[in-house]
Amino acid sequence: MRGSARVRAPRVLKERSIGDSDLTIDQLREILRSHRVLHLSLAARDRIAHSRKIVEELAEGPGALYGINTGFGVLAHQQISRSDLEQLQENLILSHAVGVGDEVPIEIVRLMLLLKAQGLALGYSGVRVLVIDYLLRFFNEDFIPIILTKGSLGASGDLAPLAHLTLPALGFGEVDFKGSRISAKIALQRLGLEPLRLKAKEGLALINGTQFMSAYAVYCLIRIQLLLATADLAAAMTLESIRGSAAPFNARIHEARPHPGQVRTAAIMRQLLTGSEILPSHLDCPKVQDPYSIRCVPQVHGAARDAYAHAHRVVEIEINSATDNPLVFREGDILSGGNFHGEPLALILDYLAIAVAEIASISERRLYLMLGGDTLGELKLPRLLMKDTGLNSGFMLPQYTAAALTSENKILAHPASVDSIPSSLGQEDHVSMGATSATKLLEVVKNTETVLAIELMSAAQALDFIHPLKAGKGVEAAHAEIRKSISFAESDRLFHDDIQCALRLVRSGALVHAAEKSVGPFTK
């Protein structure tokens, strides 16, 4: 009716079951971004219930079974009376919640909830369906446990952070509940839930596992995929600004050394440079070869791309694996092993840190090249990318920041996995230190995103001196996107603000998306 108020349709949240099939990193990205409502599949419920029945039957017997009626670690040989089994599980969570340091980012904690539920849904852990329902309810309701970054040795699993993940289900600790920090008890009341009383083996199943390392790995891989595409775009823009040659990207060169990442990167560079007016404008210049930071982009970026691909494969195996101990098998056996050991993740997390640090290293060198100005004097590219230097410092200091971050990355890229300190009075005599690998990788990723942002904002400044000649279509599209929010710098100004703006463009994917609209996709 005319004049009546329009009724807004309620937002419909899409549901997704877990436990039927493996999860991919792409699916995890989509789940995080779309806020899907998760629930256990019927098949998973049956599988979990069967596993739980085995545990309950064995718990009634007289024998000692690790994780069910014994102590833990060096205390594994000490049998616990049947009347104390529930208290044993609560004590385990409380005693292992010893994390320190900064808080884990909320998106990573959400991944931990999801990955822990996925691991338990495989049916090897012997927990009740109710336990997994709690985890998924937390995920769906933005009930985010407060977890601290430090305290895990990466074997026996991520004990401390996973204990902090579990605490709120028992009514302990604090949570971020729908954006507000409140006590876990109050948050449970708002959800209409009672604190969970853990049964035999459930506490151990919740804290044994690699979900802290895995969540960091998934989160970083999602960011690194965009970072690699951004690095190619930055390299292409810098190449145009210093009148570099596209000859090193000729497909025949890379067919002669066909590492997949190298071949792919060279193809992306050709794609981004398509339609350039700058490239043919200096074909007869006296320059014979560009410096390595330009000429070897396919080899360096490509090697990082191959490291990403290897890590991607390893992580997708890990997030769909049983990393608990002991494991409960359908035949009725309970077997102790070492699937909680984080070595597979620790190695690839360290590998990724090295690869991403190299992206920052070569980006900073390209930035430095631009600041030297136009050595041939043909396109009037001024030193420090500003005409009136002396009075103005130009882009001198943004390079300092890039250099500082690049140097910090070199320290962070030292592999944590080469170290091990025995714990539990020698029972756990080799650990992966993969949790340290995980947290420092995220810092390397953040630093490298910033270095690329500085390169891109500087390359945009340089291109403006070369216009009206047009760069390649992909480069021009990204340049136009930068200029929507960062203007050409005629003189010194607060470059901190420009860096932050460029960083937002990098992390949002706005520059890559703008280029892809012009030349087609190149992110994958």
Please report, for each region that a protein language model flagged, where it lies by residue:
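Residues that scaffold, gate, or flank divalent-cation-dependent active/transport sites
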Residues: 16, 22-57, 63-68, 72-110
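Short alpha-helical scaffolding segments that buttress acidic/His motifs in well-ordered protein cores
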Residues: 28, 92, 96, 108, ...
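FAD-binding glycine-rich core of flavoenzymes that anchor FAD
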Residues: 123-150
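FAD-binding core of FAD-dependent oxidoreductases
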Residues: 66-88, 95-118, 148-170, 199-213, ...
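Conserved, non-catalytic sequence blocks in retroelement Pol enzymes and Pol-derived host proteins
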Residues: 124, 153-155, 390
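C-terminal auxiliary extensions adjacent to catalytic cores
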Residues: 10-36, 40-47, 51-59, 168-524
